[in-house]
Regions:
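A structural signal for short secondary-structure junctions
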Residues: 35-37, 46-47, 134, 156
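Extracytoplasmic
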Residues: 39, 48, 104-106
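Transmembrane helix-bundle segments that form internal channels/tunnels in multi-pass membrane proteins
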Residues: 1-45, 52, 57-58
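Extracytosolic and intramembrane catalytic regions of membrane-associated proteins
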Residues: 54-200
Length: 200
């Protein structure tokens, strides 16, 4: 009788341990899925030669705004495939020019997404221009092609962050970093920090 009771009790204990382990694993995977779910956000990728702004919706839809008219999208897709899969993203809609959607608007390299404004600077279009009241944008995205200084852009824009793209030469990157520090501007260098995501 005692032997039977021992084995029955042991089987019951093992069953409880097994069920608890399954529950724990299920909770762990559910938590990981919840943490990795798509969230409304902006992503700037550390992909040299292909500057882009990725606008992501919480349902997995997204728009990837290429800065160059002939982008190296194959390189970007190859380097970001695991990230997109990890966060359960659908294939993004590719944008290379001005557009207008319900939540996304792009006009003359100024991208507006869920009330957040990003100005892409990849040429000298904004040099030597002034305005009575600077336009407020959250992110000033500096890419290869702009030869001026930050001071010129502060006459036109008021911004929270400067994003330095990986396409910038080392000389230009160090120069712009120095200007940011001197002006007390917050900046992120993608070459140093890697890709960054901002939740909206």
């Amino acid at each position: 009788f005692l032997l039977t009771y021992y084995f029955m009790n042991r089987r019951y204990r093992n069953l409880l341990i097994c069920l608890f382990t399954i529950l724990l694993l299920g909770t762990y995977h559910a938590t990981l899925y919840w943490l990795d779910r798509p969230r409304t956000s902006l992503v700037f990728y550390n992909v040299r030669g292909c500057p882009a702004v990725h606008c992501i919706e919480s349902d997995g839809r997204s728009w990837i705004n290429y800065v160059d008219t002939i982008p190296n999208e194959k390189r970007l897709k190859r380097m970001t495939a695991n990230y997109w899969k990890h966060h359960h993203l659908l294939p993004p809609k590719e944008i290379t020019g001005d557009c207008r959607y319900m939540v996304l608007n792009r006009q003359q390299q100024i991208i507006s997404y869920h009330g957040c404004h990003i100005c892409v600077i990849n040429d000298n279009h904004w040099r030597n221009k002034t305005t009575v009241s600077p336009l407020y944008i959250q992110y000033l995205y500096l890419c290869k092609g702009y030869d001026g200084h930050l001071e010129e852009l502060t006459r036109i824009f008021s911004f929270s962050y400067v994003i330095l793209d990986a396409s910038l030469s080392e000389y230009r990157r160090h120069l712009l970093e120095s200007e940011c520090k001197q002006s007390g501007l917050r900046f992120i260098s993608l070459s140093d920090e890697g890709s960054v995501r901002f939740l909206l």
